[in-house]
Regions:
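Alpha-helical segments flanking ligand/cofactor-binding loops in enzyme cores
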Residues: 1-2, 51
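C-terminal catalytic histidine-bearing segment of alpha/beta-hydrolase fold enzymes
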Residues: 79-120
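A conserved short beta-strand
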Residues: 3, 8-21
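Short, solvent-exposed amphipathic alpha-helical segments in soluble enzyme
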Residues: 5-9, 76, 114
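The feature captures the conserved acid-bearing segment of alpha/beta-hydrolase catalytic domains
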Residues: 21-22, 26-80
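Alpha/beta-hydrolase-fold catalytic nucleophile elbow
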Residues: 16-17, 61, 99
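Short, well-ordered coil/turn elements that cap or connect secondary structure elements
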Residues: 7-8, 55, 89-91
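Beta-sheet entry/capping signal
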Residues: 11-12, 56-59, 95
Length: 120
């Protein structure tokens, strides 16, 4: 997500198992802390970083049994992404995939999208 947000050479992105907000991560006891960027909340949250990918195509995927994805918070994240893509008239470039599985990579939506964007 981070490099896709800042490097315009990246034409398409996929982010897996990361629909988390810093404000949520900081309150969970089982969070290891490696996701915490000091001072980020002064400017925004991970959803704002993810929004920088717009208007480029991006798939956000989560496993249905991923214990690190908190349903209430992942919907807040999704809503923020939707607003950013809509503001750039790129709603059709934002994709979500909730697959059967845990905290893992799926690619079932990402691979076809990458082929479409990169191979034409």
């Amino acid at each position: 997500m981070m490099i896709s947000a800042i490097d315009p050479r990246i034409k398409v992105a996929s982010v897996s198992g990361a629909l988390n907000l810093l404000q949520e991560r900081m309150t969970l006891r089982h969070s290891c802390g490696s996701q915490i960027i000091p001072g980020l909340l002064k400017y925004g949250d991970y959803s704002e970083i993810g929004s920088l990918i717009a208007p480029r195509p991006c798939v956000w995927e989560t496993g249905s049994t991923d214990p690190l994805i908190v349903p209430k918070w992942d919907e807040v994240f999704r809503d923020r992404l939707r607003k950013a893509y809509k503001a750039l008239e790129a709603s059709d470039q934002l994709h979500f995939d909730r697959f059967e599985g845990g905290h893992e990579w799926s690619g079932r939506v990402a691979y076809p999208l990458f082929d479409k964007v990169l191979k034409g």
